[in-house]
Amino acid sequence: MTSQFASLWQQSLEILKQELKPASFDTWLKNTQLVTIQNGEAHIGVPNDLARDWLENRYATLVKNALSVVLGESVEVRFFTPSADSRRSEPSRRPVATEESSPPLLNPKYTFDTFVVGNSNRFAHAAALAVAEAPAKAYNPLFVYGGVGLGKTHLMQAIGHFVIEQHPQSRVVYVSSEKFTNELINAIRDDKTVEFRNRYRNIDVLLIDDIQFLAGKERTQEEFFHTFNALHESSKQIIISSDRPPKEIPTLEDRLRSRFEWGLITDINPPDLETRIAILRKKAILENLDVPNEVMVFIANIIQSNIRELEGALNRVIAYANLSGKSLTSEVAEEALKNIIPSHRAKVITIALIQEIVAEHYNMRVEDFKAKKRTRDVAFPRQIAMYLSREMLDVSLPKIGEEFGGRDHTTVIHAHEKITKDIEKDPQLEMTIQVLKEKIQRA
């Protein structure tokens, strides 16, 4: 390692020290080195295969971000064991990991403290917290499903962190169904199925991610069925995640499906605008980023699919601003995201857009919202438009009032309170509000 690479790596390690617990840093990163950087890829030497696999699976993004900050440009990372590279072509017979040989693969950032709760995930969060506080006594199993990047893994691992923090002697295992399958295949090949079963049946909490990948794998389903039974009969907690509910997983054995339904099934939906903004704010706070509110609102309006893409967009905007030497503004954010924003992308939601959609729905003119008319056929839609402006936008009450003919902020408060109460009493109005929100988001 040249002195230049040594210096770059030392600076990167200083950043990583702030991100990780001392024990994690000392175990996985202390004895690593930056060997070279070629074609935008940093080659990082690690002491053994276990460290390489651990870093690749759990800390690659953290290391990449730290090194990119030091270099001032984006870089990919590759971990390798120098002594192993020369024998890479030889077949490897790795032992099946045991609970003593490796701790649970939990991302240090995935805790309840960093999980942003909103309408889309409130029930799932409450269920996860209940399970964490009383393993095997609240809901067992807990089955969490939802689309990609919505926080299922975060919530699962938060349970693991909480249990370990409250009960340090607890044996917690987190594994993806793909890794479970691969370990089973290796165990059968190496005649180590006893060790494999000990690994997964002599534990207190099992967190298994993406269970839908067991579909069609009869031997793996058979093994997991017996693992599930062994744990459940011993009053051990099982938490499962999937991209769909049990009944919709194809070629899943009925006996497994029925067991997944023994406990509680809860879903996580895409976050609404308010939650997306809150997620970006939380990320900015946790990473000490100075991001103007207008930029976060812009990104939250553009990226509506999932949290992973939302946070990725913020990273892209910040990197673009830093590398181009520009200040963070919504205009710069639009420049940074121009390649990932569809040409037919939705308009940025504004008060004017909300007024336009509501006016069209009630067959009236936008100008009527700003007029002094107080008849119900005008006042009620106006109140709905004010309500939606308050719910869907992060703007001040005076600003909303100003856009509705210079009305006082107390008028906006009254409108919001009235519509909120009306929704509670009128299911039809609740449905109308939801339809209007969807129209606005698709506009």
Swiss-Prot record:
SMART domains registered for this protein in UniProt: AAA, Bac_DnaA_C
Pfam families, alphabetized: Bac_DnaA (PF00308), Bac_DnaA_C (PF08299), DnaA_N (PF11638)
Residues bound to ATP: 149, 151-153
A single cellular component GO annotation: cytoplasm
Region called Disordered, residue ranges: 83-105
Keyword DNA-binding: yes
MF terms (GO), sorted A to Z: ATP binding; ATP hydrolysis activity; DNA replication origin binding; lipid binding
GO biological process: DNA replication initiation; regulation of DNA replication
CDD domains: AAA, Bac_DnaA_C
Entry's localization field: Cytoplasm
InterPro entries, per the entry: AAA+_ATPase, Chromosome_initiator_DnaA, Chromosome_initiator_DnaA-like, Chromosome_initiator_DnaA_CS, DnaA_C, DnaA_dom, DnaA_N_dom, DnaA_N_sf
Organism domain of life: Bacteria
Composition bias, Basic and acidic residues: 85-97
Region spans: Domain II: 80-104
Entries under PROSITE patterns matching the protein: DNAA
Residue ranges, annotated region (Domain I, interacts with DnaA modulators): 1-80
Family affiliation: Belongs to the DnaA family.
UniProt xrefs under PANTHER family: CHROMOSOMAL REPLICATION INITIATOR PROTEIN DNAA
Job description of the protein: Plays an essential role in the initiation and regulation of chromosomal replication. ATP-DnaA binds to the origin of replication (oriC) to initiate formation of the DNA replication initiation complex once per cell cycle. Binds the DnaA box (a 9 base pair repeat at the origin) and separates the double-stranded (ds)DNA. Forms a right-handed helical filament on oriC DNA; dsDNA binds to the exterior of the filament while single-stranded (ss)DNA is stabiized in the filament's interior.
Domain-level remarks: Domain I is involved in oligomerization and binding regulators, domain II is flexibile and of varying length in different bacteria, domain III forms the AAA+ region, while domain IV binds dsDNA.
HAMAP family: DnaA_bact
Quaternary structure, from the entry: Oligomerizes as a right-handed, spiral filament on DNA at oriC.
Protein name: Chromosomal replication initiator protein DnaA
Upper classification of the organism: Bacteria, Bacillati, Bacillota, Clostridia, Eubacteriales
Gene name of the record: dnaA
